[in-house]
Amino acid sequence: MKFYYHDNDSSVDQCAPHDSGEPVTAEQLEKIGVLAFHYPDVEDVNRLAKERKYTNRDEVTITPEAMGGQENYEKKLKVFYEEHLHEDEEIRYILDGEGYFDVRDKDDRWIRAQLNAGDLLILPSGIYHRFTLSEKNYVHTMRLFQAEPKWVALPRPVDNNPYRQEYVKAISA
């Protein structure tokens, strides 16, 4: 697991590392409500799920083949990479492969989280973010949910959304 500021070079493929060379600490992530853990054993994930009342989960594999071919895969990656927020926490545990979550800091700068097998990321509801795979084009992830599994993305801008407003208030305190 590695965190750093995104280089914002849009001339380079979104699946490239985009490492600006400016690292981000766990403390900086916590200030924006992002939690990150490394759990080599799924039993650790089960304990966290019980503590945080995550009652449902599923698994998703993202590859060109799993998405029904290259064209569908590229369309799906574009959807994931569009900046958005959710009204629920987003919890992802990487079982295999790797991917990137980009989250906005308090100054609206992108922080990139490089996640590999065993890494778990919790994004608070209301945070603007996006996801993409690495250049390996493969990730197998477990999604955890506090209620029924759902994935409703609200594209930016939705600053008047009550979950967004609550999030901004929480990180401004």
Swiss-Prot record:
InterPro entries: ARD (IPR004313), ARD_euk (IPR027496), RmlC-like_jellyroll (IPR014710), RmlC_Cupin_sf (IPR011051). Ni(2+) binds at H84, H86, E90, H129. Its cofactor is Fe(2+); Ni(2+). It comes from the Eukaryota. Binds either 1 Fe or Ni cation per monomer. Iron-binding promotes an acireductone dioxygenase reaction producing 2-keto-4-methylthiobutyrate, while nickel-binding promotes an acireductone dioxygenase reaction producing 3-(methylsulfanyl)propanoate. GO terms for cellular component: cytoplasm; nucleus. Disulfide bonds: none annotated. It holds the Pfam family ARD. Residues 1-21 are annotated as: Disordered. It is found in: Cytoplasm; Nucleus. Fe(2+) binds at H84, H86, E90, H129. Keywords: Amino-acid biosynthesis, Cytoplasm, Dioxygenase, Iron, Metal-binding, Methionine biosynthesis, Nickel, Nucleus, Oxidoreductase. PANTHER family: ACIREDUCTONE DIOXYGENASE. Belongs to the acireductone dioxygenase (ARD) family. This is Acireductone dioxygenase. The gene is ADI1.
